[in-house]
């Protein structure tokens, strides 16, 4: 009986040490930034997406009441 308890204890400690030794997830500390670019004419996806990709290496979406704002989201 004592051998069985020690075996379970050893296995539990081994599993716990393996779980604690696992590295943190990659990219867990990446932050997202958002920038609004005001355009002089109504926003189109053909204009907004390349603009955000060139300036910020991110994604773009047309927002605003009359789609006059291009909102860019990118990794800070």
Curated annotation (Swiss-Prot):
It comes from the Eukaryota. The keyword Signal applies. It is found in: Secreted. GO terms for cellular component: extracellular region. The keyword Secreted applies. Transmembrane segments: none annotated. Keywords: Antimicrobial, Disulfide bond, Fungicide, Plant defense, Secreted, Signal. One of its GO terms (biological process) is killing of cells of another organism. Residues 1-27 form the signal peptide. Disulfide bonds join 33-76, 43-62, 48-70, 52-72. Belongs to the DEFL family. This is Defensin-like protein 163. It comes from Arabidopsis thaliana. The gene is LCR24.
């Amino acid at each position: 009986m004592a051998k069985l308890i020690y075996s379970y204890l050893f296995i539990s400690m081994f599993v716990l040490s393996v779980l604690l030794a696992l590295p943190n997830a990659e990219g867990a500390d990446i932050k997202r930034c958002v920038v609004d670019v005001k355009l002089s004419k109504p926003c189109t996806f053909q204009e907004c997406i390349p603009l955000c990709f060139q300036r910020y290496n991110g994604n773009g979406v047309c927002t605003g009441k009359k789609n006059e704002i291009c909102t860019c989201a990118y990794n800070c």
